[in-house]
Amino acid sequence: MALKLTSPPSVFSQSRRLSSSSLIPIRSKSTFTGFRSRTGVYLSKTTALQSSTKLSVAAESPAATIATDDWGKVSAVLFDMDGVLCNSEDLSRRAAVDVFTEMGVEVTVDDFVPFMGTGEAKFLGGVASVKEVKGFDPDAAKERFFEIYLDKYAKPESGIGFPGALELVTECKNKGLKVAVASSADRIKVDANLKAAGLSLTMFDAIVSADAFENLKPAPDIFLAAAKILGVPTSECVVIEDALAGVQAAQAANMRCIAVKTTLSEAILKDAGPSMIRDDIGNISINDILTGGSDSTRNSTAMLEENTVSDKTSANGFQGSRRDILRYGSLGIALSCVYFAATNWKAMQYASPKALWNALVGAKSPSFTQNQGEGRVQQFVDYIADLESKQTATTVPEFPSKLDWLNTAPLQFRRDLKGKVVILDFWTYCCINCMHVLPDLEFLEKKYKDMPFTVVGVHSAKFDNEKDLDAIRNAVLRYDISHPVVNDGDMYMWRELGINSWPTFAVVSPNGKVIAQIAGEGHRKDLDDVVAAALTYYGGKNVLDSTPLPTRLEKDNDPRLATSPLKFPGKLAIDTLNNRLFISDSNHNRIIVTDLEGNFIVQIGSSGEEGFQDGSFEDAAFNRPQGLAYNAKKNLLYVADTENHALREIDFVNERVQTLAGNGTKGSDYQGGRKGTKQLLNSPWDVCFEPVNEKVYIAMAGQHQIWEYSVLDGITRVFSGNGYERNLNGSTPQTTSFAQPSGISLGPDLKEAYIADSESSSIRALDLQTGGSRLLAGGDPYFSENLFKFGDNDGVGAEVLLQHPLGVLCANDGQIYLTDSYNHKIKKLDPVTKRVVTLAGTGKAGFKDGKVKGAQLSEPAGLAITENGRLFVADTNNSLIRYIDLNKGEDSEILTLELKGVQPPTPKAKSLKRLRKRASADTKIVKVDSVTSREGDLNLKISLPDGYHFSKEARSKFVVDVEPENAVAIDPTEGTLSPEGSTMLHFIQSSTSASVGKISCKVYYCKEDEVCLYQSVQFEVPFKVESELSASPTITFTVTPRAPDAGGLQLQGTR
């Protein structure tokens, strides 16, 4: 997770700031202030005019200059409603207060002022966001708002019209001007207000309300639509407004604007730059509208002349004087900062004065670039000596006594850590960059094992779920962390030391002073040299203490993991036609294959130990594999071997594993394009296979991109994402940014892939033609660098709140299922309506089978679904596979899949072969007549029905086992069947006792021009010597193809 202390976006600079965790620049999205989007985010005029709306409208190009002595032709007047025609702004705020009072939330009418003129949804939702109202339902709140407002405040003929409103509208019509109401309110409120004000709807040539628009004021869409309906050019329209959003919308639409002071002061309005300002609508004359008036409230001729002389064009196309740019820019900065602070409060809570100072001038540390030679350690020794002599180093605060510890008893600097060199690792377990540095810390711990040195992990949570001690304990177990870890959930140590990014290391001296502070990954050498220098310097001062710390490793206190068949399983895949479930048994470093009822079939990677090795199923090794994708055509399984930074391929025909990309080293290439293992990868977390073009799409969590591997040419390259860790939806790969994508699934039409963008807590759709993306649910749709918009709220689109989703799956019917991992829930997303609903889970981590609403999971991750609607879930922290029958609707239950025959891995030699001798659940057992001759040739002939042939690519094979092992010598013991499906085995019985030979065959065959199929058959041949004569018995068998729903195994296409 490339996260730093978040700051409001600049509207001027195109600054690039360095991400401390990924060491790639994070660009601050910067556009000149023109108007705001629906939620108040300031965007450029160009951007806004290109944004999609439900009603298609277009603006005229603004004139290059405005004549200073001519107001210009006026053909239409567009009246805002609230605050202009109707004295309803205060009434609206009072109705909104009533809504929140009913919810038990204390608010005041002033809380709603910043959101006036932006539409009811934002009007209510903005305050709900600021007040941190959990479970806020904007649709329900909006409905209740209208009920209260219409019933209590806006009764017909209640006299809410401003004095002079009726007269001015009438006078405009008498002058031949067209008049329209153009309001950000919904039509129901517009009609009610006009009636309450005594203004007949028939007075107006058009009434344009919020219902038909995606973008409300300050976007120009409503005004542009009104002009289009009236048939009047935008340059001939005059707008009357009371809100900043309205003034800005008028400017964006190239319309003159008269502002009234019914809501805001003249000073605030003047900064927005309206054409003129009046107290209220009763003070606007027809002369003001037709000629622009003549008093000081209109922009003066001198100022207009100054603007004409000093016209400058900004990089974003804004034309105006330097004064205009400064004026509008200052207003934009102010309002952007207010909105940013309100919507990014979770990010802002990590700030501290010291963090801001460190972000500006840098924390105290030696230079790591000046000397890379042999004298580097001595350079750091000299630096430490200078630091101690000046006594300028920061003292590390003591750990608060209330903090919980893992892997150790509570530690204190003045007691346990005194006399030791300490690295404080500020981390949060969701962060991919924090995972990347764990091998560096392990290296240091091993190198300085017998010395007065230790690492202390200071867990400083980003997500709410990460503050839970049990969740952190599971992370410690999952990543095999053996050093002490403290749960600093309230960020005390973080703030005191001014930390502003994950991960950050503080190297602390034996006397509790900060020697160096280093942010980001890739600093093994720097940390190693600083620690070596510290041990050298303080060793010479005789202040080191080698007393061991009181360790108590969590892995030694959790017996369940020692006997569990699975250990933190990550992802799933299904071979529906072959009745197989693939499980990435991540912390056992293997892939498990069962049938759909949980019966063991085979394992790939037998030792359970971390490794990186190709070869047979027994010899192959993985390192915490995650994503899986099945290629039915070739009977291959693609594996995202995450901590080997590799893409692996499991070949079930030849029972081999090979590496397709990556070589075990973490890469930093953001473009790719190399072939095979020459192309390095960076923490691939999930994969999906696109069969038409034969591409494997990779969710590259480590560098926030989507990559593709071509099966046809073996080249791996970036597909989408510029590598910046952001939540940015663009139209091209270069303008799109992801934030630790951790799940990927193809849509049924293969036109889009769906992404679980975990760090932005959003679900996004990736266009497989253009490489661009769009938001479906969750995340912050406006501030791309705000990765702190998370929670637990069902709803539609951006109102949805998720918490670090890790898995996504699109079913054949187009419905999307997702694991809302840190909310411990399974949810469903309709990609058309963008509505998200909870299917299962309570929101609290736990384990409980039963009805979906009451059942509990613990950080679920991977998903897979069968054709008959059984949804499998990798329940990661429970180390279980769960499933839901989706056909039962509200009566659905979460049940636990019983894994029969799946054992924890064992490092014993040939353990895999022993397991494979057992017939799998899909094997047909054929018992044949006894063989009574001492010696002979056993002929095996397998035939197929008409219309089928043996596969030429996937050769059928056999393997022979005998019980007892040495009772019969059979040669060969394994091999392939002939193209006609036959083989001959020579046998010699060495014992007169009865024995059994088992000939296990894997038969691959195809129907002409259709799918290819697979059948597992085991022939049990009894042996007993009754004759010394030689014989050549024959075993015949005809394969009977089985339908998919009967469990028959099918392979798409190998012919």
UniProtKB/Swiss-Prot annotation:
Binding residues for Mg(2+), per the UniProt record? D80, D82, D242
InterPro entries registered for this protein in UniProt: 6-blade_b-propeller_TolB-like, HAD-like_sf, HAD-SF_hydro_IA, HAD_2, HAD_sf, LDLR_classB_rpt, NHL2_NHL_rpt_dom, NHL_repeat
Read off the Pfam families from this record. HAD_2, NHL, Thioredoxin_8
Cofactor needs: Mg(2+)
GO CC terms: chloroplast; chloroplast stroma; chloroplast thylakoid; chloroplast thylakoid membrane; nucleus; thylakoid membrane
Briefly explain the null phenotype: High light intensity-dependent and irreversible nonphotochemical quenching (NPQ) due to a decrease in chlorophyll excited-state lifetime.
State which residue ranges cross the membrane: 328-345
Q: Which family does it belong to?
A: In the N-terminal section; belongs to the HAD-like hydrolase superfamily. In the C-terminal section; belongs to the thioredoxin family.
Q: What is this protein called?
A: Protein SUPPRESSOR OF QUENCHING 1, chloroplastic
Source organism (scientific name): Arabidopsis thaliana (Mouse-ear cress)
Gene assigned in the entry: SOQ1
